[in-house]
A protein has these predicted regions:
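N-terminal Rossmann-like or analogous alpha/beta NTP/dinucleotide-binding catalytic cores
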Residues: 1-4, 10-129, 280-284
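A residue-level detector for conformationally permissive "hinge/kink" positions
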Residues: 4, 9, 135, 169-173, ...
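A generic short-segment signal for beta-strand/edge and adjacent turn/coil regions
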Residues: 5-9, 142-143, 201-204
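Glycine- and acidic
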Residues: 5-10, 137-139, 250-254
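Short, charged/polar micro-motifs that form catalytic or ligand-binding hotspots
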Residues: 11-14, 18, 139-146, 221-225
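Short helix-capping/linker segments at secondary-structure and domain boundaries
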Residues: 33, 133-139, 240-249
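Positively charged, phosphate-engaging catalytic surfaces used for nucleic-acid and nucleotide handling
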Residues: 78-191, 201, 230
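Conserved nucleotide- and phosphate/pyrophosphate-binding catalytic cores
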Residues: 147-148, 154-297
Length: 297
C-alpha cells in the first residue's frame, strides 16, 4: 500500500509540459486506487524569483490547481496542499528534516552562495514534508529537474525512521525552439499554455516550433526529415499521439520525405487544439470544485 505525491511551483500559467507528470499520476492513481497529494510551492517561487510577490504566486497557485483538477482527479482521494496555507501540517515534518540537513550539503547540491536567502536554503525540507504526510510509503512521479530535492529526501528519510520515497522521473517536453531545452512558463514564444486559443497555438507552432526538415521542399523530398530533433514530432511522441502505429507511420513518412514539415505541424496543431478545447472547459468547471480539493489542516 502506498500513496502518490507530485506538485508544481506556481510562478506562472500552466503549460503543456507541466501536464505530463500529472497525467501519469492520474493513471497511477486509477490503476492502484491510491490517495494523491498535490503540492503547490508558492513559498519557493516567492523566495527564488526576485520580482515575485506572495500575492502573485498565491494567485498562480489557485490557477494552476484548476489545470490539475481538470485532468479528472476526484476530491475524495486527492488533496491539494498550498505551502503558505497549510504550513501548520507541513512545518512539524519539515522541522524534523531541517535538523538533519546541513548547509554544506545543500550548498553542494544546489550551488547556494552567501547571497542566497535562507528561505531557499530551508526549502528542501518543505518539499520533503508531503512525502511523510501519510504513514505509508510514497511514490513520486515528477520532472527530472526536481531530482536533487528528492535525493536529499531519500538520504534523510531513514534518519527519522521513515521509508525512502520511490521516484519516477518523467520526460521533459522540449521548448518550441529546440529539443535541448525544456518548456518554460517564462518564455511565451516557446511555450504552449493550457489557456492558449486555437489561433495562438497555430501561430506558435508554425512560427516557433523547431523543424527537423530540410531547407526546401525539393531537398526534403530527397533527403527526408529528422524526427529525432523535430519538436512537432517530439510533442506527438511524448503526449499527443497515443496510437503507436500512427506515430510510427508519421515518423517513417517524415523521415522518408513523404511528409513535409508543414504537414507535420498541421497534425500537431489539430491535436493540441482538440485537447485544449476539452481541457479548457474542464478547467472552468473545476472552479466550482476547487474548495473540495484544498487540504484542510
Amino acid at each position: 500500500k502506498f500513496f502518490l505525491y507530485t506538485g508544481r511551483g506556481p510562478s506562472g500559467h500552466t503549460h503543456i509540459g507541466h501536464l505530463v507528470p500529472w497525467v501519469f499520476a492520474k493513471w497511477l492513481q486509477d490503476k492502484f486506487k491510491t490517495k494523491m497529494y498535490f503540492q503547490l510551492t508558492d513559498d519557493e517561487k516567492f523566495w527564488s524569483k526576485k520580482d515575485m510577490t506572495l500575492e502573485k504566486t498565491s494567485k498562480f497557485a489557485l490557477e494552476n490547481a484548476l489545470d490539475f483538477i481538470a485532468l479528472g482527479f476526484k476530491p475524495e482521494n486527492t488533496k491539494i496542499i498550498i505551502d503558505t496555507k497549510n504550513i501548520k501540517t507541513l512545518y512539524p515534518i519539515a522541522a524534523q528534516f531541517a535538523k538533519r540537513i546541513n548547509f554544506s550539503n545543500t550548498k553542494a547540491v544546489f550551488g547556494f552562495e552567501n547571497e542566497t536567502n535562507i528561505g531557499m536554503i530551508f526549502y528542501t525540507s518543505l518539499q520533503s514534508a508531503p512525502c511523510f504526510i501519510e504513514d505509508m510509503p510514497v511514490l513520486i512521479p515528477f520532472g527530472v529537474d526536481q531530482d536533487p530535492h528528492f535525493r536529499i529526501t531519500r538520504d534523510v528519510a531513514p534518519k527519522i525512521n521513515k521509508p525512502k520515497p520511490a521516484l519516477i522521473h518523467n520526460i521533459m517536453i522540449p521548448a518550441l525552439g529546440g529539443p535541448k531545452g525544456k518548456m518554460s512558463a517564462s518564455n511565451e514564444n516557446e511555450t504552449i499554455y493550457t489557456t492558449d486559443s486555437p489561433e495562438v497555438v497555430k501561430k506558435k507552432i508554425n512560427k516557433y516550433a523547431f523543424s527537423g526538415g530540410q531547407p526546401d521542399i525539393e531537398e526534403h523530398r530527397k533527403k527526408g526529415g529528422n524526427p529525432d530533433i523535430d519538436v512537432s514530432f517530439q510533442y506527438l511522441r511524448i503526449f499527443f499521439e497515443p496510437d503507436d502505429k500512427k506515430l510510427q507511420q508519421i515518423h517513417d513518412d517524415y523521415k522518408s520525405g513523404k511528409m513535409l514539415t508543414g504537414e507535420l505541424k498541421e497534425i500537431l496543431i489539430e491535436k493540441i487544439n482538440k485537447f485544449l478545447a476539452i481541457h479548457q472547459q474542464k478547467r472552468e468547471d473545476a472552479r466550482s470544485q476547487l474548495d473540495e480539493f484544498l487540504f484542510k489542516d
